[in-house]
């Protein structure tokens, strides 16, 4: 009973903090206020430790890794989003990750706490198939890969919203700015005379900032997806070994296995298109955006069917 009360406190505080951070970042999109970054970082730190406290409390209750049902997995996802937020807080100087990760953590947390029935949120014993030493390696690798892939895809979606319809393929450091520069300097347009020196300078500065945003988004999306792809590969391989031990077959074309393979192939295509690091365009960003929906299909969608070997304890 005492564990239930502690969990309730941790869950509610973390949800309030996620909501507060999301609100602060939305305000910061329109009104750049220095103190907002400080408050949002501290609030996300509180949310991170509260979610960590929930996971530890659930472990003390069940004596197994808190990844045994949908509720625990979703809470682990929100924990991972908050951790990535704090990591990128240090490394991302532009702050693009804040507006992406904070709403993601809040929505996942809200779905887990407000949408799932009480029965699904209650601690449960592991089904026999999950009572294995492979649980930590396979399930944690898959969930962490989902966290990083979702984060990278959200960054790609943000990039696409800035980039779509502007140019088809640009060289990051030069081409985007050069095109705008020559467009402005085209004597047939007489833009210098029409807009004046002040507007001309403002346009160049604005375009330079947009190019910097696109560069940063592309960099973080590629690096995050690369990490997630590696973890997804480890998760699939460890799952195949575990499946052979539990069910006598490395691969059975279970719905979740099939969609995991489809997701892996889509992100493999994305990384293949990013071999030339100087290039970016709509194609890679759209591929990563497609991966965002595939991850959710793989994580939640196939369980709505109520069939398959991975259906235990979820949405059936």
Swiss-Prot record:
Disulfide bonds: none annotated. Belongs to the CcmF/CycK/Ccl1/NrfE/CcsA family. It comes from Adiantum capillus-veneris (Maidenhair fern). This is Cytochrome c biogenesis protein CcsA. Pfam families: Cytochrom_C_asm. It comes from the Eukaryota. Required during biogenesis of c-type cytochromes (cytochrome c6 and cytochrome f) at the step of heme attachment. It is found in: Plastid, Chloroplast thylakoid membrane. The chain crosses the membrane at residues 9-29, 39-61, 70-90, 94-114, 143-163, 224-244, 257-271, 289-309. Its main location: plastid. It is a multi-pass membrane protein. One of its GO terms (biological process) is cytochrome complex assembly. May interact with Ccs1. The keyword Chloroplast applies. GO terms for molecular function: heme binding. Keywords: Chloroplast, Cytochrome c-type biogenesis, Membrane, Plastid, Thylakoid, Transmembrane, Transmembrane helix.
